[in-house]
Amino acid sequence: MTEVERILDQCRRAFEGNAWHGPALLELLSDVKSEDAAAHPIAAVHSIWEIVLHIAAWKNACKRRLEGDRAQLTDTEDWPIVKQTTSEKWQDAKDSLLKNHQQLLEAISRLDEWRLDTPVIEGMSSVYITLQGVVQHDLYHAGQIAILKKALGPA
């Protein structure tokens, strides 16, 4: 297995499932309803919905960086505001997250091994560190989502 294949495996485990640590991001989101996703059960903490939009934005930014774009997020892009909390809009948010994840995996799969040690873009961390950061980011926010689900109470 190449290093790129190992990175892809870790990205999939953290996001899709079969992760060593417990439920992956998609597994945690599978039973979340729109009203729960929009709720703020813990004061001064982002909602599940806001976290999903945030993760989607960063997956897209990392994909763009792999493609040579300097992709910087504004505060609004980093933490988008949820304006409509319908079940359709919640599904759109989850679909966007999945699409951005799949597009990032496609970009990673096209990488040559030698690129892993080069800066993702000039003046930034290496491609390898960036991609490990994607996995870490998914796991960090998966933990937040798990805690928010517990704070919401029984489903």
What feature does the model see in each segment?
Residues 2-22, 26-29, 34-80, 119-155:
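Short, contiguous alpha-helical
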Residues 82-118, 129-134:
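Acidic/histidine-rich alpha-helical segments that form the ligand environment
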